[in-house]
Amino acid sequence: MSMLTVAMPKGRIFDEAVGLLRKAGYNLPAEFEASRKLIVDVPEENMRFILAKPMDVPTYVEHGVADVGVAGKDVMLEEERDVYEVLDLKISECYLAVAGLPNYEKKHDLNPKVASKYPHLATRYFKEQGEQVEIIKLNGSIELAPLIGLADRIVDIVSTGRTLRENGLVELEKMMTITSRLIVNPVSYRMKDERIDEMVERLLQVVEGDGA
């Protein structure tokens, strides 16, 4: 039986995804979360885990170095990679929002600029809204942009809204709810269909059970 390679995003999603896999009966070592290795083999399950930046997970899966992966819907929409999205894991729920300073008024914004680490997603959203904006790509600390005059608004992930409040920003528009998804390489799905189908079925039972 060939090894199944799983790409996992480092950070909050990783911890929740590992918990989900354990609930689904996968025997993952207790020190798994504390490991600083980027590649972790689990011989008991004949699985290999690749720990990557969230934005890179779909790339690893698309190119076949990982058979399956866990990725946020925000990353999927931004990256638009050639992968199958097979299951909504319903973990790490948050939402994408447009935010800005409390006194922001769209009608007075003659040269609208929006900062985001999701330039493609933001561009599509504002186009659908019939609004022409200049998108400025940032890789972090997006909330800084309106405070220093780089942009009037931002598009970013919101979990509790605490970061916005602490930086004096307010939510202007809620764009969409985001959860993490199980994604699969199309070739792997054909070559390792039994193992992948088994994983999907086991995870589905946990997801539906938790949601009951």
From Swiss-Prot:
Pathway: Amino-acid biosynthesis; L-histidine biosynthesis; L-histidine from 5-phospho-alpha-D-ribose 1-diphosphate: step 1/9. It catalyses: 1-(5-phospho-beta-D-ribosyl)-ATP + diphosphate = 5-phospho-alpha-D-ribose 1-diphosphate + ATP. GO terms for biological process: L-histidine biosynthetic process. Gene3D superfamilies: Periplasmic binding protein-like II. InterPro entries: ATP_PRibTrfase_cat (IPR013820), ATP_PRibTrfase_CS (IPR018198), ATP_PRibTrfase_HisG (IPR001348), ATP_PRibTrfase_HisG_short (IPR024893). Belongs to the ATP phosphoribosyltransferase family. Short subfamily. This is ATP phosphoribosyltransferase. It comes from Halalkalibacterium halodurans (strain ATCC BAA-125 / DSM 18197 / FERM 7344 / JCM 9153 / C-125) (Bacillus halodurans).
